[in-house]
Amino acid sequence: MSLSRRILNTTRLPGLRITSSIRCQWGQKSRDCRHFQSYARLLEAPRNPYKDEENVSKAPKIVRGASKVYKNADEAVADIKSGSTILSAGFGLCGTAETIIEALERRGPESLHSLTAVSNNAGASIPGGLGALTQSGQVNRLILSFIGSNKVLEKKYLEGKIAIELCPQGTIAERLRAGGAGIPAFYTPTGVSTLLQTGGIPTRLGPPAEGSKENTVLEKGQVRETREFDGKTYSMEKAIKGDVAILRAWKVDEAGNCQFRYTTRTFGPIMAKAAKVAIVEAEEIVPVGSIAPADVHLQGIYIDRIVPATVPKKLELKKTRAPEGKEDTSNKSDAIIRRDRIARRTAKELKNGYYVNLGIGIPTLAPSFLSPETKVWIQSENGILGMGAYPTEEEVDPDIINAGKETVTLIPGASTFDSAESFAMIRGGHIDVSVLGALQVGANGDLANYMIPGKIFKGMGGAMDLVSNPDETKIVVATEHVAKDGSAKIVQDCSLPLTGAKVVSTIITDLCVFEVDRINGGLTLTELAPGVDVEEVRQKTDAKFEVASDIKSME
């Protein structure tokens, strides 16, 4: 049988979906099959961003076989296009590709603009990092976890001058890892039952409406799809891919194999894998074979361009300790005495052999109150297991910092790793205890510690990840009992955006200790600080609580 020549040739019409209905008596001898019916329905095909001419990849072209080494960063970024998505590695200013960022800034907003940048944080309180590109107006959209001390960026967001998609640090890491591994999406416990899940964190703000003091919301946050597995709720996160990744490494050979120093690794490897083109600035460019196979942290297959690092490393927060025996412990202020009391009691939650994560602020003081026979492994979410004390002046290394961007040391047996590995430890419940600060704690164990709408917009950093598995990792809050304005931090119900729902097991303040019933909700007062009575705690607590029959003295 021969088919009619009049049948529509659809091979020359891209973007069509064809629906055919064919019924034919194939044994019939007539030239045209009487019962043959064919029709083509011309439908608008679903938009394919990979084929649509308006969405052709903005990534520079890769030329296989050519040298990966470029003379300088300006040459390497010359063909990056406006509208590109840039994945910028580093943590604070540690491991940030400052040489490449300065080259991008030199392109100017006339030549390079409308960039979307993905980073853990964008700049700092001192010049450096992506702050230069946000201030120049070349970046108009950010995906990050932490604004922190970047007051300029915080102000630009609150004034509606830049779009910011807040995303937990560990989720950004996993979204990048998924993007580089060809996985389109995944489910995570992080952020469930918070504004992150419901899309309640605005991406872009506008000026207040007439007669209102609150900003209008020009772009809402993305609502996450949820699903239950084994009786627990998870939210779906989509992978992140970029056009260009920029990172800094210690040694890079001419084939692109990279070796990083200590905590500079963080987002470098996972961003390089998630980008179409990866540009690395190298402190040392070495011949192929100079880096031992076991020392290659990122393989050359993921690196496309190599430039010499010419901008010196920047140190955000140099924190040191006095040499042994020379600490000045006299004349402590009342505030320091209160903080020490909290830290001393917090140290009792850290048992010998425990793996622990300590949030910034008061939690970091706890190890200094451990007894000599108690040894713990401190994990820092920027990629340390086995974090030590602050360094002496002679020990300061800008490539070894903690989650608060402060200089630290490493103890014998310590290891460093990238952010995907770090948050696998955290989300997977491999940490025994995690200690965090708080803005508010609810009587049911709810925790709020990252935002005061309209006033403070710091970002959640890694906090949402740290509290995402409270059944396996005990969550302890270490905080002063009241805020600076005298308002209660321990409340019946949190009014601030939640970091996690029903996650806190123990609350330690300068006045007392509460144990939290996460399942049924409710607080029990178990310890009182010296000189504090139950009535004082009641006056300064905006939540109902029971008093233990065997209440103890807080030591």
Mark where each language-model region is:
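N-terminal mitochondrial targeting presequence
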Residues: M1-A66
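Conserved phosphate- and dinucleotide-binding cores of soluble alpha/beta proteins
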Residues: R47-E54, R64-K71, V77, G92-G108, ...
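Glycine-rich phosphate/diphosphate-binding loops that line cofactor/substrate pockets in enzymes
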Residues: D74-T85, L176, E349-Y354
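Nucleotide donor/acceptor-binding cores
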Residues: S84, L112-L115, N140, G353-Y354, ...
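N-terminal low-complexity or amphipathic/hydrophobic leaders
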Residues: I86-A103, A343, L350, Y355-G386
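Beta-strand segments within the central parallel beta-sheet cores of soluble alpha/beta enzyme folds
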Residues: H113-V118, W377-E381
